């Protein structure tokens, strides 16, 4: 049913040149409207369709576009007799292809209440939803929204000009809707499965000719840009023509602006998306590149009568090991329990699914002397390059004999390191360091960050209830410059002879009020230096809905239950 480009250009020329032929009958849309009316069982009233010839003066003012490329790529405007098309954009009635003359109830009062004539309005909604005209959506179920992603299915590709396909926007409805779902409009009026009806709709010319639009600007406009943007210009002009004043928008228009949701398009749909983003940021070291690298040997460790945590790490355990096997092997050193690795410490006493260990496990003894006894039974090399004593214990399982596993204890003195005891520790100059390696103690962490940024006065390793490290720490600087350098670095790669690990640096967070409203708690922190403050939920959404700030990632304190 689609027309060729040459035929479309010829029909446009006929519409302007022939004064004796009625507008509706000469345009290619006339037969289409009649066939649509036939499908509707002649429910549309064509008695008031205007047949007055078009004013000749308009044609004289238009440029000759018989051989113009703009003519070939344009679609016809349907003028009515009640108006002489102005030299600018067409008004709302002109854009509606003469539908006002089809006696469509409620056309002249799109903001009427819901208790208007429902039967006539249903007929109007059906036709207008087929045309996908922005004014049709005023009466439909998604007022003043742009075209949906696939309003006519695959038949959308049959439109002759690229401007229709180029103007498809994935936006939410601008204003409130009578329907709980925009998809409800797809089932009203006609069945979307009618191929014949789709062919009719795909053949409609619903945009004004490009030469007609070209006269609206102060200077010449690029035909290519006009081909893409003509649909947007048309919709904006139509909305401006029908939009009521701010004082006359009582029910369907909650705000004075015609486009109230443009400012809300960037807002997250889920109000709890901030928490999800904050949780994802905690694992950012796994997916981000390091901005700087430290390589070298860790400072030697010299202990005199060290005190150990009652919890030890076992690495490289046999894959078929069971909890009973672990208890039977290590209970000779004292009473103990087994903690299997679990997500965020959940169900730590339960083995993984399928009873398949991840290759490591934690042993928790009741007494610290049990750990000493275990280490004495291990083989170790005290002369390692980094000054670290590595402990290995031989154990067996049902299918593996004499497997050597690594035992990593934790000395309580390694949890804190103070470089300057007289220096006051300022939380506002403290950074949080995540994704630490298990062999990294506070002294080594302080030395690494002092080499990179300078000014370190304190370093601490975060521990659990058994005083065993949990993989994070804190470092305090004595000046703001070093602190900001560390925060800006964000990701640092640490290379030693024993391991290579990428750590993550963030500002250390405290309990604080929102620094915008100063009335609500501020659990969310923006680490970008444009913001760099605490926010409550409402102030976060308000601040970060602005252009250029939407990419900021939130931080939250990792509060354990």
Curated annotation (Swiss-Prot):
Lineage: Eukaryota, Metazoa, Chordata, Craniata, Vertebrata
Protein name: Cytoplasmic polyadenylation element-binding protein 1
The keyword Phosphoprotein belongs to this UniProt entry's keyword annotation: yes
Span list, region Disordered: 159-194
Keywords annotated in UniProt: Activator, Cytoplasm, Membrane, Metal-binding, mRNA processing, Phosphoprotein, Repeat, Repressor, Ribonucleoprotein, RNA-binding, Synapse, Translation regulation, Zinc
Biased composition (Low complexity): 176-194
PANTHER family linked: CYTOPLASMIC POLYADENYLATION ELEMENT BINDING PROTEIN CPEB, CYTOPLASMIC POLYADENYLATION ELEMENT-BINDING PROTEIN 1
Alphabetical list of SMART domains matching this protein: RRM (SM00360)
Comment text on domains: The 2 RRM domains and the C-terminal region mediate interaction with CPE-containing RNA. The interdomain linker (411-429) acts as a hinge to fix the relative orientation of the 2 RRMs. The ZZ domain (509-566) coordinates 2 Zn ions and is probably implicated in mediating interactions with other proteins in addition to increasing the affinity of the RRMs for the CPEs. A continuous hydrophobic interface is formed between the 2 RRM.
Binding site for Zn(2+) 2: 526, 531, 544, 552
Single GO biological process annotation from the record: regulation of translation
SUPFAM superfamilies per the UniProt record, alphabetical: RNA-binding domain, RBD
Key word Electron transport present: no
Modification(s) after translation: Phosphorylated on serine/threonine residues by AURKA within positions 165 and 196. Phosphorylation and dephosphorylation on Thr-171 regulates cytoplasmic polyadenylation and translation of CPE-containing mRNAs. Phosphorylation on Thr-171 by AURKA in embryonic ovaries at 16.5 dpc (mostly pachytene oocytes) activates CPEB1. Not phosphorylated on Thr-171 in embryonic ovaries between 18.5 dpc (diplotene oocytes) and metaphase I. Dephosphorylation on Thr-171 by PP1 in embryonic ovaries at 18.5 dpc (mostly diplotene oocytes) inactivates CPEB1.
Organism: Mus musculus
Residues binding Zn(2+) 1: 514, 517, 536, 539
């Amino acid at each position: 049913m689609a027309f060729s480009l040459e035929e479309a250009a010829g029909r446009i020329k006929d519409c302007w040149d022939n004064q004796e032929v009625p507008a509706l009958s000469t345009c290619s849309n006339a037969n289409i409207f009649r066939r649509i009316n036939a499908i509707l069982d002649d429910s549309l009233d064509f008695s008031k369709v205007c047949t007055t010839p078009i004013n000749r003066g308009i044609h004289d003012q238009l440029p000759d576009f018989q051989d113009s490329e703009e003519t070939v790529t344009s679609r016809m405007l349907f003028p009515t007799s009640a108006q002489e098309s102005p030299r600018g954009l067409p008004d709302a009635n002109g854009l509606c292809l003469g539908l006002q003359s089809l006696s469509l109830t409620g056309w002249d009062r799109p903001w009427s209440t819901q208790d208007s004539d429902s039967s006539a309005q249903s007929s109007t909604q059906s036709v207008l939803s087929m045309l996908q005209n922005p004014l049709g959506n005023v009466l439909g179920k998604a007022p003043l929204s742009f075209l949906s992603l696939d309003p006519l299915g695959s038949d959308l590709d049959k439109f002759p000009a690229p401007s229709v396909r180029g103007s498809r926007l994935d936006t939410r409805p601008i204003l409130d809707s009578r329907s709980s779902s925009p998809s409800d409009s797809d089932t009203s009026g006609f069945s979307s499965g009618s191929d014949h009806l789709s062919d009719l709709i795909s053949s409609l010319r619903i945009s004004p000719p490009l030469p007609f639009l070209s006269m609206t600007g102060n200077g010449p406009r690029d035909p290519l840009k006009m081909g893409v943007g003509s649909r947007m210009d048309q919709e904006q002009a139509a909305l401006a023509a029908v939009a009521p004043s701010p004082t006359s928008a009582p029910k369907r228009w909650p705000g004075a602006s015609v486009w109230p949701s443009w400012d809300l398009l960037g807002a997250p749909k889920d109000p709890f998306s901030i928490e999800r983003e904050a949780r994802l940021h905690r694992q950012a070291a796994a997916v981000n590149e390091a901005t700087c690298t430290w390589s070298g040997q860790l400072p030697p460790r010299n202990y005199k009568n060290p005190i150990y945590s009652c919890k030890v790490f076992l690495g490289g355990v046999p894959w078929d090991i069971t909890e009973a096997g672990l208890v039977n092997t290590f209970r000779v050193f004292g009473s103990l329990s087994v903690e299997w690795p679990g997500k965020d410490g959940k169900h730590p006493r339960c083995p993984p699914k399928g009873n398949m260990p991840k290759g490591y496990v934690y042993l928790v003894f009741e007494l610290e002397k049990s750990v000493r006894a275990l280490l004495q039974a291990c083989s170790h090399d005290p002369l390692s390059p980094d000054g670290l004593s590595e402990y290995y214990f031989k154990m067996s399982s049902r299918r593996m004999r004499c497997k050597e596993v690594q035992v990593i204890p934790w000395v309580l003195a390694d949890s804190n390191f103070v470089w300057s005891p007289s220096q006051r520790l300022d939380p506002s100059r403290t950074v949080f360091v995540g994704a630490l390696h298990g062999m990294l103690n506070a002294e080594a962490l302080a030395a690494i960050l002092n080499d990179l940024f300078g000014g370190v006065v304190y370093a601490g390793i975060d521990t659990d209830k058994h005083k065993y490290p949990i993989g994070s720490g804190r470092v305090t600087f004595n000046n703001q410059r070093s602190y900001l350098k560390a925060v800006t670095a964000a990701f640092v790669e640490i290379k030693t002879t024993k391991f290579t690990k990428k750590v993550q640096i963030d500002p250390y967070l405290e309990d604080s009020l929102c620094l915008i409203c100063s009335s609500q708690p501020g659990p969310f922190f923006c680490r970008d230096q444009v913001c760099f403050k605490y926010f409550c939920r409402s102030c976060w959404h308000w601040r970060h809905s602005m252009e250029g700030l939407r990419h900021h990632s939130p931080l939250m304190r990792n509060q354990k239950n």
